[in-house]
Amino acid sequence: MSLIHRRLYRISGLSSVNAWNLQIREAVNRNDPVESLLLFREMKRGGFEPNNFTFPFVAKACARLADVGCCEMVHAHLIKSPFWSDVFVGTATVDMFVKCNSVDYAAKVFERMPERDATTWNAMLSGFCQSGHTDKAFSLFREMRLNEITPDSVTVMTLIQSASFEKSLKLLEAMHAVGIRLGVDVQVTVANTWISTYGKCGDLDSAKLVFEAIDRGDRTVVSWNSMFKAYSVFGEAFDAFGLYCLMLREEFKPDLSTFINLAASCQNPETLTQGRLIHSHAIHLGTDQDIEAINTFISMYSKSEDTCSARLLFDIMTSRTCVSWTVMISGYAEKGDMDEALALFHAMIKSGEKPDLVTLLSLISGCGKFGSLETGKWIDARADIYGCKRDNVMICNALIDMYSKCGSIHEARDIFDNTPEKTVVTWTTMIAGYALNGIFLEALKLFSKMIDLDYKPNHITFLAVLQACAHSGSLEKGWEYFHIMKQVYNISPGLDHYSCMVDLLGRKGKLEEALELIRNMSAKPDAGIWGALLNACKIHRNVKIAEQAAESLFNLEPQMAAPYVEMANIYAAAGMWDGFARIRSIMKQRNIKKYPGESVIQVNGKNHSFTVGEHGHVENEVIYFTLNGLSLFAKDKHVLYKDVYKEQSYELFI
């Protein structure tokens, strides 16, 4: 019997509106929205008028289809019926338009409703939140309170979504306070949402407090997973692993989400051991065969610099998605193995899997990071073929960054000028490109133009501008932008901004001012800041301040060789050989070695790597003959002496 005949047979005995409603509801419940709408049509043709139970079922079917045309058709029938003012029907209609991304239609229906309950308000709030209209959502929430409608847990969780979307800690804290006043904070579903959102908004401590406040008997697997997700945002693998052990001791059974979030926490070489333990447990529990889990583990191994394990997982996959290919390609690109990344990209095309925007962005980013200009040009020329045209702002931003890092600043500017819809990221990337390539005045000029065109700079924009000021020695301009950032744009300086200012002051020889700035910082200075000061001390031969900077670096990064070598060189340049010997002794005691630096250049599409003091290159004789010839052009004997001394000092520590 055909589908049409079966339908005709089924509806032939329907003799009442309730019978039709039952059939429509069953079709919706078995996720067959098309059948629901066909039944609705046949019901109308049969002379049966829908009632206040029919319309909510049909509205749900339209929402499942996400078809605005169907929504408008059902709404047209509704406004002709006597049930348009029914609060239950009206709420279902608002929800229908919201789920079809027609928030404006939903708002019109909402405004015309003579009666609304908390569910109606929640449906409209959800629409504004999902569409990113945070201001409208909170304005509606205020209106809801003025109308004396009591919010419930759904209201709170809906508005938490807005805070999550905006990554606004202030909004989240405000909704947390509302939730406590309403008494919904004791509900575990609300607490779970708070935990994950606090993590996303950058407040791990508050996420921990909410988790710990949940009674042990009330915690669910979702509670633990929410906390793991918060840890993954910060890359706190060790704390996440400790919490996972506690979860097992309390006899909770981990699920797929548990392992995905835990693996997402282990994204660097230091946490590879924890990542492997998590992976082995996932295998033991049989949750490692899910494609999303495999993709996450591939990403984990790749970012932990274990591309061999990542590739093994990738190769044994029975089926792959675009994400599978992309995370593996990205792993090679991040490591600098562009040849392997490109080979895998070709294999992806050959397999019939179409690369997406993220795939191309991964390749372009890798080319910029490791200076693979020719490969970058090849990808740029073929981006259109894979549906990522030059008018895509994300592609434009990535290409500007890539060409800038590869030294092709004119190509970067050409893309910038031809980007149709520039964003703050576009301007920031171009400014950073100029700063990176030593074209500092152009960077500052472009920043001024950005401000004139009413673009609002962010913290990364100011970082690029301060770097330009530092490298150009523009101390006055640097202070000006540093204060503008705080006073005009309300952006709190981060450690990187302070590092730039320390670098700028150091270059100008104002080491006491730089040290004072560090001491007055609200945050604890990191290795980058002390390193900038130490480098400035080396340039200006200030042993006293250098010792303070070096001591801080020794405490922060006791196994990093660079600060020891820098301090030893400062002592040597000052003729303080006792200090020089003391640093050497400390390095031997702590088994710290300075490995020679490596650089890579690309000639005729082929990468060539060199290390400091290397004598094993196939073109060794030609290279050193050329270098010796170039050294004859060094007119300043002091500069030449410093270069020779620096090479000798490196050899002492290798």
Curated annotation (Swiss-Prot):
Residues 1-65 form a transit peptide. It comes from the Eukaryota. GO terms for molecular function: RNA binding. It is found in: Mitochondrion. The keyword Transit peptide applies. One of its GO terms (biological process) is RNA modification. Keywords: Mitochondrion, Repeat, Transit peptide. PPR repeats lie at residues 86-116, 117-151, 152-186, 187-217, 220-254, 255-289, 290-320, 321-355, 356-390, 392-422, 423-457, 458-488, 494-524. Residues 605-635 are annotated as: Type E(+) motif. One of its GO terms (cellular component) is mitochondrion. Residues 529-604 are annotated as: Type E motif. The keyword Transit peptide applies. Its main location: mitochondrion. Pfam families: E_motif, PPR, PPR_2. NCBIfam families: PPR (TIGR00756). PANTHER family: PENTATRICOPEPTIDE REPEAT-CONTAINING PROTEIN, TETRATRICOPEPTIDE-LIKE HELICAL DOMAIN, DYW DOMAIN PROTEIN-RELATED. Belongs to the PPR family. PCMP-E subfamily. This is Pentatricopeptide repeat-containing protein At4g19191, mitochondrial. It comes from Arabidopsis thaliana. The gene is PCMP-E1.
